[in-house]
Amino acid sequence: MRKTLDIDLSPEEYFTPAMMLQAVARKAGLQSGDVKHVEVLRRSLDSRRGIRYHTTVEVYCNEDYTPRDFRGHYQDCHTKAAVIIVGAGPAGLFAALRALEVGLKPIIIERGQPVEQRRLDIAQLGRTRQVNPESNWCFGEGGAGTYSDGKLYTRSTKRGNIDYVLQRFIEHGADPAIAIDAHAHIGTDKLSGIIANMRRTIEDHGGEYHFSTCVSDLIVEREGAQLTVKGVRDTAGNTYSGNAVILATGHSARDIYRLFANKGWMMEAKPFALGVRVEHPQSLINEIQYHRSPAMRFLPPAAYSLTTQVEGHGVFSFCMCPGGVIVPAATAEGQQVVNGMSNSKRNSPYANSGIAVTVGLEDVPQYANEGALALLRFQQEVEQAVYQAAGNTISAPIQRLTDFCQSRPSQSNNKSNYLGPTVNCPIHQLLPPFVVRCLQQGLQLFDRKMHGFYTAQASVLAVESRTSSPVRIPRDETMQHPQLRRLYPCGEGAGYAGGIVSSALDGINAINALQPLIPLPNHGL
């Protein structure tokens, strides 16, 4: 017999198997000896009033437990109809895995390098401070998500089957605990191996990868009054043909936006967010969030999620990394961009998070003549200005949080876990005035929710500008571009996702949308 129940457990009860067994048996009205197994289905940590794990468990009473099978069901697609997937980030990879399930051969075109070489290129960036524009913290196998902590949660459950995404990660090497955590993460140190395992699955079942291959154009044919995409062309002149093209190039592939602009294909400006990355001692965040509880020894490094409104703008935390580091995330020379990541153990002494301000067309009327690329142009100019302020290097401008909020230069700065040099800068003078005002007020308002957040122990680093794409490539109800049939814009780069899980689901949905066009056996999902 099995019984599912919800139970609140103290950290000590949760992490001590005998205590958990007793608590669950008591809640279920059973004797401890009758419980053969307790399977945790869901857990979330609540530290608001005392520290408790809200837990959903399945109790096996006098019945043996059979572990879940997380394996996918992939077809041999070596000789099947092909679909071109531009980009090997989460949207592209999960589109490829889903393609194998439904009987399509995925051909993945990736501008960057496999994760093994990408790791070496990033190490080279750390030594030389020179950005490789095709292989960096954003570009390469796995996309930007490979180096962003591997957070696996999304606010929306309407996009698709989140458990399916988690199962594919577990199948390829992720800790099965991601299937139960309300705020699951994998860790940058684990993700590269998982991404490589996904590549092996895709190639073993007939998929192809073309690395160091940058798409320069779409192959478009006119069929009556309709334009239909037949494939892509790369910068070397090679062509790749398929039954459809999934465009999953990520939020930093600015050359794709320029291609669309030059061709006159439909795009639109999309609101995005821009700000700074805030860094605190992790011990301070733990004390604030866990209220100096004796149970802290059982608990993971504390996280936070903050949001407020200032002058009609949203101000919010983004990509919060407990026990993390800050990385130089520029994709070309002449840019300064920061992002955060953390490894699976989240054991750095620092916590960091983007704190960003929403930006819309109404905020930048001076760029109106740029049309769909108005916000992209604004984003570029801010990144260039910060780069110049840092001495034309990828050194990160840094300032004490309290000094930033009071519009005064810092006389000295805190230590930072930025993977590169920092330079003392008055960041309040570098960013657009409306962004600075919103950040200054928002950071102080956050102290009302997390007393101690506003402190001279914290630093701000600039600039957090790649929160999402400032451009949307539109699509209709079939997920195709309105002008270009059989082109499926998806993921963050098309403006339809924001994070690993939502991007993965968008890639899956793009493949599902192909099925009315190409006769395929339906399998699952």
For each predicted feature, which ranges?
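Residues forming the flavin
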Residues: 2-53, 57-147, 151, 155-525
